[in-house]
């Protein structure tokens, strides 16, 4: 019951922020133009700062576990490949990029540390899970959203150049790279800078969620119900069912298993919607999957956690 309450405390406020954005839109306080500008702002400033802050304070040398980081990286890559393969079965190819990203991209950076701290009292292996998965999440998101952009026909030199440029100049990837470099160089984080980073990064999630809620089109969402449900099932159940037994066989236990669970089975991150909108996609599938996985993840995560506890794995 405690785990269910914790999961609900982590996910219900996120869902309510989206509903609040939708409410503000309906009463005329937050129109679509304003919400789109808010999206761009979150994408360019608060979200990169949030990821920088998460990674800059990690002591990589002390926490490092090569096998664990490589495992997180490889299963993330395989998950993306599976999502791409399943997306080829979709009739509407214009939503393929959004479907792929929504099916694999977790709230790892936001929920990982908090979830493990709630269970074990310390962040454990969450920072290493973030290092092994989050940079790849974002690099592949740029590639997928560029290649499967509506109206795009195949890969050519121009698109390849544009995609590589997009990776290098993507604000989120710059934030991750800066955070990893800061951590690797063991640079101190002055109190003033830490507070500034925390304050700026702290607005990323609420602003992004409200902007998403304000632009959420219920009629369009119901029109995309089938790909939304499929992507949500893959995100919350499919990947965990496939890869968690493998993690157990390899020998991962306790904090590492919880970190892998969050990486594979947490709700689709709001940044997937922010990035999709800012890279020329409609955003309907992204926002729908974020909403559905957010509503359901408290129960699916708790269910997975209960199963692992029954087997004495955590």
Segments predicted by a language model, with ranges:
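Alpha-helical transmembrane segments of multi-pass small-molecule/ion transporters
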Residues: 1-314
């Amino acid at each position: 019951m405690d785990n269910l309450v914790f999961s609900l405390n982590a996910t219900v406020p996120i869902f309510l922020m989206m509903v609040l954005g939708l409410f503000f839109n309906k009463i005329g306080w937050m129109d679509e133009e304003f919400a789109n500008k808010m999206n761009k702002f979150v994408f360019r400033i608060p979200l990169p700062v949030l990821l920088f802050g998460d990674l800059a304070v990690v002591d990589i040398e002390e926490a490092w576990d090569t096998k664990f980081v490589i495992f997180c990286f490889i299963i993330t890559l395989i998950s993306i490949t599976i999502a791409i393969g399943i997306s080829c079965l979709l009739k509407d190819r214009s939503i393929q990029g959004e479907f792929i990203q929504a099916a694999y991209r977790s709230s790892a950076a936001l929920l990982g540390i908090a979830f493990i701290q709630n269970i074990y009292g310390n962040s454990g292996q969450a920072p290493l899970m973030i290092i092994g998965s989050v940079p790849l999440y974002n690099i592949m998101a740029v590639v997928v959203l560029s290649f499967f952009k509506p109206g795009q026909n195949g890969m050519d030199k121009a698109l390849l150049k544009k995609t590589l440029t997009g990776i290098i100049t993507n604000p989120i990837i710059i934030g991750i790279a800066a955070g990893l470099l800061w951590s690797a160089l063991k640079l101190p984080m002055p109190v003033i800078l830490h507070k500034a980073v925390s304050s700026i990064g702290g607005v990323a999630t609420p602003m992004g969620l409200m902007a998403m809620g304000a632009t959420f089109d219920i009629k369009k969402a119901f029109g995309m119900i089938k790909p939304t449900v499929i992507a949500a099932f893959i995100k919350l159940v499919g990947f965990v069912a496939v890869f968690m037994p493998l993690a157990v066989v390899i020998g991962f236990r306790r904090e590492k298993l919880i970190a892998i669970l969050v990486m594979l089975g947490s709700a689709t991150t709001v940044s997937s919607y922010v990035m999709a909108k800012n890279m020329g996609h409609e955003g309907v599938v992204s926002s729908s999957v974020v909403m559905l996985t957010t509503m359901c993840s408290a129960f699916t995560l708790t269910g997975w956690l209960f199963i692992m506890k029954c087997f004495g794995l955590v």
